[in-house]
Protein backbone atom coordinates (compact mmCIF):
# COMPACT_ATOMS: atom_id res chain seq x y z
CA UNK A 1 0.00 0.00 0.00
CA UNK A 2 1.60 3.31 -1.08
CA UNK A 3 -0.43 5.54 1.25
CA UNK A 4 -0.94 4.64 4.90
CA UNK A 5 -3.75 6.04 7.02
CA UNK A 6 -3.67 5.73 10.80
CA UNK A 7 -6.37 6.94 13.14
CA UNK A 8 -4.72 7.48 16.52
CA UNK A 9 -6.69 7.91 19.71
CA UNK A 10 -5.67 11.04 21.58
CA UNK A 11 -6.43 12.02 25.15
CA UNK A 12 -9.69 13.24 23.65
CA UNK A 13 -10.64 12.92 20.00
CA UNK A 14 -8.58 11.25 17.27
CA UNK A 15 -5.72 12.28 15.00
CA UNK A 16 -5.45 11.13 11.39
CA UNK A 17 -1.88 10.45 10.22
CA UNK A 18 -1.48 10.12 6.46
CA UNK A 19 1.91 8.78 5.34
CA UNK A 20 3.11 8.76 1.74
CA UNK A 21 4.82 5.39 1.66
CA UNK A 22 6.69 4.70 -1.55
CA UNK A 23 10.32 5.34 -0.55
CA UNK A 24 11.66 3.63 -3.67
CA UNK A 25 10.19 6.42 -5.81
CA UNK A 26 10.87 9.16 -3.23
CA UNK A 27 7.15 8.99 -2.47
CA UNK A 28 6.31 10.29 -5.95
CA UNK A 29 2.57 10.55 -6.49
CA UNK A 30 1.11 7.87 -8.73
CA UNK A 31 -2.50 8.14 -9.85
CA UNK A 32 -3.40 5.37 -7.42
CA UNK A 33 -1.77 7.28 -4.54
CA UNK A 34 -3.68 10.43 -5.45
CA UNK A 35 -6.94 8.46 -5.41
CA UNK A 36 -6.02 6.97 -2.03
CA UNK A 37 -5.20 10.37 -0.54
CA UNK A 38 -8.46 11.84 -1.79
CA UNK A 39 -10.50 8.93 -0.41
CA UNK A 40 -8.78 9.20 2.98
CA UNK A 41 -9.30 12.95 3.20
CA UNK A 42 -12.94 12.63 2.20
CA UNK A 43 -13.48 10.05 4.92
CA UNK A 44 -11.72 12.07 7.61
CA UNK A 45 -13.47 15.30 6.65
CA UNK A 46 -16.79 13.63 7.44
CA UNK A 47 -15.64 11.68 10.51
CA UNK A 48 -16.44 13.60 13.69
CA UNK A 49 -13.87 11.55 15.60
CA UNK A 50 -10.98 12.95 13.53
CA UNK A 51 -10.02 16.38 14.86
CA UNK A 52 -6.63 17.07 13.23
CA UNK A 53 -4.64 15.56 10.35
CA UNK A 54 -0.89 15.07 9.92
CA UNK A 55 0.70 14.47 6.50
CA UNK A 56 4.23 13.07 6.30
CA UNK A 57 6.49 10.97 4.08
CA UNK A 58 8.05 7.56 4.75
CA UNK A 59 11.73 6.75 4.35
CA UNK A 60 14.81 8.86 4.94
CA UNK A 61 15.15 10.63 1.61
CA UNK A 62 11.93 12.45 0.77
CA UNK A 63 8.57 13.83 1.79
CA UNK A 64 7.44 13.68 -1.85
CA UNK A 65 9.42 14.17 -5.07
CA UNK A 66 6.34 15.21 -7.08
CA UNK A 67 4.16 13.44 -9.59
CA UNK A 68 5.22 10.03 -10.88
CA UNK A 69 6.44 11.20 -14.29
CA UNK A 70 7.65 7.71 -15.18
CA UNK A 71 4.11 6.38 -14.85
CA UNK A 72 2.80 9.11 -17.14
CA UNK A 73 5.62 8.66 -19.64
CA UNK A 74 5.03 4.91 -19.90
CA UNK A 75 1.28 5.41 -20.31
CA UNK A 76 1.81 7.85 -23.17
CA UNK A 77 4.51 5.74 -24.81
CA UNK A 78 2.51 2.52 -24.98
CA UNK A 79 -0.59 4.36 -26.21
CA UNK A 80 -2.94 2.25 -24.11
CA UNK A 81 -4.23 5.12 -21.96
CA UNK A 82 -4.19 8.35 -24.00
CA UNK A 83 -6.56 9.93 -21.50
CA UNK A 84 -4.33 9.21 -18.50
CA UNK A 85 -2.39 12.53 -18.37
CA UNK A 86 -5.58 14.62 -18.33
CA UNK A 87 -7.15 12.32 -15.75
CA UNK A 88 -3.98 12.27 -13.62
CA UNK A 89 -3.54 16.04 -13.46
CA UNK A 90 -7.24 16.66 -12.94
CA UNK A 91 -7.24 14.35 -9.92
CA UNK A 92 -3.98 15.76 -8.58
CA UNK A 93 -5.15 19.37 -8.78
CA UNK A 94 -8.46 18.49 -7.15
CA UNK A 95 -6.61 16.73 -4.33
CA UNK A 96 -4.36 19.76 -3.75
CA UNK A 97 -7.36 22.08 -3.69
CA UNK A 98 -9.09 19.86 -1.15
CA UNK A 99 -6.04 19.92 1.14
CA UNK A 100 -6.11 23.74 1.04
CA UNK A 101 -9.83 23.69 1.81
CA UNK A 102 -9.81 20.86 4.35
CA UNK A 103 -12.25 21.68 7.17
CA UNK A 104 -9.91 20.60 9.98
CA UNK A 105 -6.35 21.64 10.93
CA UNK A 106 -3.72 19.95 8.75
CA UNK A 107 -0.07 19.72 9.81
CA UNK A 108 2.57 18.88 7.20
CA UNK A 109 5.95 17.54 8.34
CA UNK A 110 8.41 17.48 5.44
CA UNK A 111 11.93 16.13 5.17
CA UNK A 112 14.39 15.58 2.35
CA UNK A 113 13.10 16.15 -1.17
CA UNK A 114 9.94 18.26 -1.53
CA UNK A 115 9.45 19.06 -5.20
CA UNK A 116 6.68 19.75 -7.69
CA UNK A 117 3.58 17.86 -6.65
CA UNK A 118 5.12 17.29 -3.22
CA UNK A 119 5.28 21.03 -2.69
CA UNK A 120 1.68 21.23 -3.87
CA UNK A 121 0.64 18.87 -1.07
CA UNK A 122 2.85 20.55 1.52
CA UNK A 123 1.72 24.08 0.64
CA UNK A 124 -1.89 23.11 1.23
CA UNK A 125 -1.21 22.27 4.88
CA UNK A 126 -2.32 24.77 7.51
CA UNK A 127 0.96 24.35 9.41
CA UNK A 128 4.22 23.40 7.66
CA UNK A 129 7.25 22.00 9.46
CA UNK A 130 10.55 21.08 7.78
CA UNK A 131 13.66 19.23 8.90
CA UNK A 132 17.15 20.70 8.32
CA UNK A 133 17.83 18.36 5.37
CA UNK A 134 14.87 19.62 3.32
CA UNK A 135 15.25 20.62 -0.34
CA UNK A 136 12.34 22.43 -2.00
CA UNK A 137 11.91 23.16 -5.70
CA UNK A 138 9.43 23.58 -8.52
CA UNK A 139 11.57 21.98 -11.26
CA UNK A 140 8.86 21.56 -13.92
CA UNK A 141 10.62 23.92 -16.32
CA UNK A 142 13.45 21.40 -16.67
CA UNK A 143 11.06 18.96 -18.38
CA UNK A 144 9.28 21.58 -20.47
CA UNK A 145 6.31 21.94 -18.14
CA UNK A 146 5.18 24.89 -16.02
CA UNK A 147 4.83 25.23 -12.23
CA UNK A 148 1.43 23.75 -11.40
CA UNK A 149 -0.28 22.20 -8.32
CA UNK A 150 -1.35 25.63 -7.06
CA UNK A 151 2.00 27.32 -7.72
CA UNK A 152 0.32 30.34 -9.31
CA UNK A 153 -1.01 30.98 -5.80
CA UNK A 154 1.84 30.05 -3.46
CA UNK A 155 4.75 31.25 -5.63
CA UNK A 156 3.09 34.61 -6.22
CA UNK A 157 2.98 35.15 -2.46
CA UNK A 158 6.77 34.94 -2.06
CA UNK A 159 8.68 38.18 -1.40
CA UNK A 160 10.80 39.97 -3.98
CA UNK A 161 9.32 38.14 -6.98
CA UNK A 162 11.20 35.04 -5.86
CA UNK A 163 8.30 32.94 -7.08
CA UNK A 164 9.17 34.02 -10.62
CA UNK A 165 12.78 33.08 -9.95
CA UNK A 166 11.78 29.61 -8.73
CA UNK A 167 9.44 29.06 -11.65
CA UNK A 168 11.91 30.17 -14.33
CA UNK A 169 14.96 28.37 -12.95
CA UNK A 170 13.73 25.37 -10.98
CA UNK A 171 16.16 26.52 -8.27
CA UNK A 172 16.47 24.37 -5.15
CA UNK A 173 15.94 25.96 -1.75
CA UNK A 174 17.55 24.69 1.43
CA UNK A 175 15.95 24.86 4.86
CA UNK A 176 17.05 28.45 5.55
CA UNK A 177 15.78 29.61 2.15
CA UNK A 178 12.49 27.82 2.75
CA UNK A 179 11.94 29.53 6.09
CA UNK A 180 13.18 32.87 4.79
CA UNK A 181 10.62 33.07 1.97
CA UNK A 182 7.74 31.61 3.99
CA UNK A 183 7.27 28.24 2.27
CA UNK A 184 7.51 26.66 5.73
CA UNK A 185 6.62 27.92 9.18
CA UNK A 186 9.30 26.37 11.37
CA UNK A 187 12.05 23.77 11.51
CA UNK A 188 12.07 20.58 13.55
CA UNK A 189 14.81 18.03 14.12
CA UNK A 190 14.16 14.58 12.60
CA UNK A 191 14.44 12.91 16.00
CA UNK A 192 11.71 15.19 17.36
CA UNK A 193 9.04 14.14 14.85
CA UNK A 194 7.87 11.11 16.81
CA UNK A 195 7.92 13.11 20.04
CA UNK A 196 5.73 15.71 18.38
CA UNK A 197 3.21 13.05 17.35
CA UNK A 198 3.21 11.73 20.92
CA UNK A 199 2.60 15.26 22.18
CA UNK A 200 -0.30 15.70 19.77
CA UNK A 201 -1.77 12.40 20.96
CA UNK A 202 -1.65 13.59 24.57
CA UNK A 203 -3.86 16.60 23.85
CA UNK A 204 -7.59 17.05 24.30
CA UNK A 205 -9.09 17.75 20.87
CA UNK A 206 -12.66 18.96 20.80
CA UNK A 207 -13.76 18.52 17.20
CA UNK A 208 -14.40 22.27 17.08
CA UNK A 209 -12.19 23.53 14.26
CA UNK A 210 -11.39 26.97 15.66
CA UNK A 211 -10.58 25.63 19.13
CA UNK A 212 -8.46 22.76 17.79
CA UNK A 213 -6.63 25.07 15.40
CA UNK A 214 -5.83 27.44 18.26
CA UNK A 215 -4.64 24.56 20.44
CA UNK A 216 -2.40 23.24 17.65
CA UNK A 217 -0.97 26.71 17.00
CA UNK A 218 -0.08 27.16 20.67
CA UNK A 219 1.39 23.67 20.93
CA UNK A 220 3.64 24.17 17.89
CA UNK A 221 4.93 27.41 19.36
CA UNK A 222 5.95 25.54 22.51
CA UNK A 223 8.02 22.79 20.90
CA UNK A 224 11.79 22.89 20.80
CA UNK A 225 13.22 23.99 17.46
CA UNK A 226 16.80 23.84 16.15
CA UNK A 227 19.12 26.75 16.81
CA UNK A 228 18.67 28.58 13.52
CA UNK A 229 22.32 29.68 13.64
CA UNK A 230 23.29 26.03 13.13
CA UNK A 231 21.24 25.62 9.95
CA UNK A 232 22.89 25.87 6.52
CA UNK A 233 23.19 29.49 5.36
CA UNK A 234 20.57 30.79 2.95
CA UNK A 235 21.63 30.66 -0.70
CA UNK A 236 19.03 33.25 -1.63
CA UNK A 237 20.25 35.80 0.90
CA UNK A 238 23.62 36.07 -0.88
CA UNK A 239 22.05 36.81 -4.26
CA UNK A 240 18.88 38.72 -3.40
CA UNK A 241 20.06 42.23 -4.39
CA UNK A 242 21.20 41.14 -7.86
CA UNK A 243 18.32 38.75 -8.48
CA UNK A 244 15.72 41.30 -7.44
CA UNK A 245 17.15 43.82 -9.93
CA UNK A 246 16.70 41.35 -12.77
CA UNK A 247 13.35 39.97 -11.62
CA UNK A 248 11.73 43.40 -11.74
CA UNK A 249 12.37 43.74 -15.48
CA UNK A 250 9.07 43.96 -17.39
CA UNK A 251 9.26 40.81 -19.55
CA UNK A 252 10.48 37.24 -19.11
CA UNK A 253 12.81 37.67 -22.08
CA UNK A 254 14.54 40.59 -20.35
CA UNK A 255 14.69 38.69 -17.07
Model-found features: residue ranges?
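Conserved CoA-thioester-binding segment of acyl-CoA-metabolizing enzymes
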Residues: 1-56, 97, 247
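Hydrophobic/aromatic residues within transmembrane alpha-helices
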Residues: 55, 68, 121-122, 177-178
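Glycine- (often His-adjacent) and acidic-residue-rich active-site loop
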Residues: 57-94, 144
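Glycine-rich beta-to-alpha active-site loop
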Residues: 99-143, 165-166, 170-171, 175
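Gly/Pro- and small hydrophobic-enriched strand-loop and loop-to-helix capping segments
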Residues: 125-147, 182-197, 255
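Contiguous mid-protein beta-loop-alpha structural module that forms a pocket-lining wall or clamp
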Residues: 157-205
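Globin-like tetrapyrrole-binding proteins
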Residues: 196-198, 207-228
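Conserved small/polar residues in nucleotide/adenosyl-binding loops
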Residues: 245-251
Amino acid sequence: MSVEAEELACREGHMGVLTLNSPGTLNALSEHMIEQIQDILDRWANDDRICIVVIQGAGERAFCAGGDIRELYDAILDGQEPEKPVRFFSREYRMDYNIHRFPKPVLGIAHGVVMGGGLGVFSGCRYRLVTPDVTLAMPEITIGLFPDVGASWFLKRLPGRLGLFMGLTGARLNVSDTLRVGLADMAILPEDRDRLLDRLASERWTGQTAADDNRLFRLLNQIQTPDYRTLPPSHLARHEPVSYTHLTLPTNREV
